[in-house]
Amino acid sequence: DDFQLIPMISKCRTKEGRRKTNLYGFIIKGRSHLRNDTDVVNFVSMEFSLTDPRLEPHKWEKYCVLEIGDMLLRTAVGQVSRPMFLYVRTNGTSKIKMKWGMEMRRCLLQSLQQIESMIEAESSVKEKDMTKEFFENKSETWPIGESPKGVEEGSIGKVCRTLLAKSVFNSLYASPQLEGFSAESRKLLLIAQALRDNLEPGPSILEGYMKQLRSA
């Protein structure tokens, strides 16, 4: 109950379609009672790596590095053995940073769900699984958004990036932590639009804006 052992993992699929979990290390976290957004929780991170710390020792001054054994790696000519190291250090993060981290993760999931819906709709129309063709067809374009020129289209890669960027910006602008900054950002967009329309904002407006932006 006094400590939590949190694995650092990622999940993917192999070329054969099997699910795979990759383990990169662990985080050891003690008890914490974070009340304010700026309260800090300390933890110890332990990361597996094949990077030899002796090559660039100045990079790892804050780490305790242990050689924990060897790892067999597959190469084009067969298997080779490489020493494995464990990089250990103390670190800390605040309550608000952890909250933002969770929200940014949800942004990725949200944009992936939208892509999944597009693939399902395309598969339903063609009456077959279109996942592979969806990503490999370089010539097909998809609607991204509207501009003064009309509907903008781009590759599926650009669609993915646009959806992710929209999710991130929506998350940021909806955050009460950034309410003041968001308000000043909107003013900046209005100033930029005024300059494009050859309507020069007065010096007092710009000076006041910069002062408010710095305080926000």
Curated annotation (Swiss-Prot):
GO terms under biological process: viral RNA genome replication
Pfam families referenced in this protein's UniProt entry, alphabetically: Flu_PA
PTM text: Phosphorylated on serines and threonines by host kinases, including human casein kinase II.
Highest taxon listed in the record's lineage: Viruses
Keyword Thylakoid included in the entry's annotation: no
Keywords linked to the UniProt accession: Phosphoprotein
Transmembrane domains' residue ranges: none
Keyword Phosphoprotein part of the UniProt annotation: yes
Molecular function in Gene Ontology: RNA binding
Subunit structure: Influenza RNA polymerase is composed of three subunits: PB1, PB2 and PA.
Free-text function comment from the UniProt entry: Implicated in endonuclease cleavage of capped RNA primers. Displays an elongation factor activity in viral RNA synthesis. Dispensable for viral transcription, but not replication.
Family label: Belongs to the influenza viruses PA family.
Protein name: Polymerase acidic protein
UniProt source species: Influenza A virus (strain A/Chicken/Hong Kong/FY150/2001 H5N1 genotype D)
